């Protein structure tokens, strides 16, 4: 296992900003808004080219009694228990706050290596304000400005690297890092998307068989995208929990806008997508828009109807027929009825995930593509335009993931949408794509008998 460093501190001290800089990603949502991070968010920091450590972004520690804050607090404590070291972040502009003495006491109970990171030092002229933090009693401390990338190299080279080298043998860590990178590369990435409160986080907890994600009846509990590795039947998967896609448009809510953008980016980066629908709400306009975006992204789609324990067999059948009717223009492999809370029907998901993933990765030969095109044309010829029949000459694979087929011919720009759809469906059924969308591009071939001027 890679060494684990956890980022701890109050809300809005810059943990997510530092997490993004150390991991060289934008995985953690950052805004001037307290309580944005709720679940543990894992990333990787490379100390050298072949040597990396795990870093964990956590929710800001506060001592409120609300349910979500309590669950966030529990997640942070779990991160401290499993880690090898702690970066305790404080805000230089605020000075020492009373909660930070309480946080210090909690950290010391676990007897973990701790480095005090005094963040947001840019523009601070009062040295006495920074010196206040020494009263927290940590021997090792460093001053940085995460948002200005100031002091980050010192943090890595003078603090993290020497400590990791003293605790872990270099060659062993390099080997672990390489094995981990290989495992991550071979993992199937699955985006879990849907409206707020449909049970995305509950589903991941059910598959993992432990409470990894924060859940509640309150819509919008998950704000960030969170990657959760799961091993099942000796295979590695990464499930990505996302913020619920709400149909409400709020001009003032920038957080909601950022969440939507990150969810759409997650779909594009994943191998396949689970569209989760609440059995009580049935399928909505928002679900249809999401399924359309998934198809345009070229990702396999699996429909998951959650909370199906509330439906009778007849209601399930009616809902299944309704979804098939509403999504008749979209490609999806299967409709799964589950109850994530009761762990019913969740194991069957892995079979569909494996089938859809392997289908999307299949290699298609040019000869096979040509053969299918000729079969399609023989069965239903292209239309005649201006006295001449549109001629499809040859076809080949343009891209493999997402699958894109290039068809060359004469007058292909005049092909009707109806005929294009016919070709698309013909290729889809013949290749047995099983929920994986196909893109078809048409290219006009040059007539060699027309002289070039």
From Swiss-Prot:
InterPro entries: G_ENGA, GTP-bd, GTPase_Der, KH_dom-like, KH_dom-like_a/b, P-loop_NTPase, Small_GTP-bd. Residues 362-446 form the KH-like domain. GO terms for biological process: ribosome biogenesis. GTP 1 binds at residues 9-16, 57-61, 119-122. Keywords: GTP-binding, Nucleotide-binding, Repeat, Ribosome biogenesis. One of its GO terms (molecular function) is ribosome binding. GTP 2 binds at residues 194-201, 241-245, 306-309. Residues 3-167, 188-361 form the EngA-type G domain. GTPase that plays an essential role in the late steps of ribosome biogenesis. Belongs to the TRAFAC class TrmE-Era-EngA-EngB-Septin-like GTPase superfamily. EngA (Der) GTPase family. Associates with the 50S ribosomal subunit. This is GTPase Der.
């Amino acid at each position: 296992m890679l060494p684990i460093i956890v980022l701890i501190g109050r809300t809005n001290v810059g943990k997510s900003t530092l997490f993004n800089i150390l991991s060289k990603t934008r995985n953690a949502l950052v805004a001037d808004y307290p309580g944005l991070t709720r679940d543990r968010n894992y990333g990787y920091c490379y100390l050298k080219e072949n040597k990396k450590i795990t870093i964990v972004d956590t929710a800001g520690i506060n001592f409120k009694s609300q349910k979500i804050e309590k669950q966030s607090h529990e997640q942070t404590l779990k991160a401290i228990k499993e880690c090898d070291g702690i970066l305790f972040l404080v805000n230089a502009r605020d000075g020492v706050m009373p909660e930070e003495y309480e946080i210090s006491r909690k950290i010391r109970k676990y007897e973990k290596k701790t480095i005090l990171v005094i963040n947001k030092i840019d523009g601070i002229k009062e040295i006495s304000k920074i010196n206040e933090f020494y009263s927290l009693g940590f021997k090792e401390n460093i001053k940085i400005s995460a948002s200005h990338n100031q002091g980050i190299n010192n943090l890595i080279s003078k603090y993290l690297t020497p400590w990791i080298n003293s605790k872990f043998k270099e060659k062993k860590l390099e080997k672990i890092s390489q094995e981990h990178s290989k495992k991550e590369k071979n993992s199937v990435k699955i985006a879990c998307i849907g409206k707020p409160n449909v049970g995305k986080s509950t589903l991941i907890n059910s598959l993992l068989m432990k409470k990894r994600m924060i859940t509640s009846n309150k819509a919008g509990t998950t704000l960030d995208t969170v990657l959760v590795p799961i091993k099942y039947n000796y295979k590695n998967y990464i499930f990505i929990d996302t913020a619920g896609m709400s149909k409400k448009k709020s001009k003032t809510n920038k957080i909601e806008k950022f969440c939507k953008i990150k969810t759409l980016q997650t779909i594009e980066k994943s191998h396949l997508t689970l569209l989760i629908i609440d059995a009580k709400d049935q399928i909505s306009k928002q679900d249809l828009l999401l399924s359309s975006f998934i198809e345009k992204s070229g990702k396999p789609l699996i429909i998951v109807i959650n909370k199906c324990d509330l439906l009778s067999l007849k209601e399930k059948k009616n809902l299944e027929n309704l979804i098939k009717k509403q999504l008749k223009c979209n490609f999806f492999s299967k409709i799964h009825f589950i109850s994530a809370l009761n762990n019913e029907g969740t194991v069957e998901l892995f079979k569909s995930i494996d089938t859809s993933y392997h289908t999307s990765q299949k290699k298609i030969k040019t000869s096979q593509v040509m053969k299918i095109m000729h079969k399609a044309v023989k069965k239903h010829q292209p239309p005649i335009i201006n006295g001449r029949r549109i001629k499809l000459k040859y076809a080949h694979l343009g891209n493999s993931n997402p699958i894109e087929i290039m068809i060359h011919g004469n007058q292909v720009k005049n092909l009707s949408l109806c005929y294009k759809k016919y070709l698309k469906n013909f290729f889809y059924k013949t290749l047995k794509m099983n929920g994986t969308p196909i893109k078809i591009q048409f290219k006009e071939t040059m007539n060699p008998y027309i002289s070039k001027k």
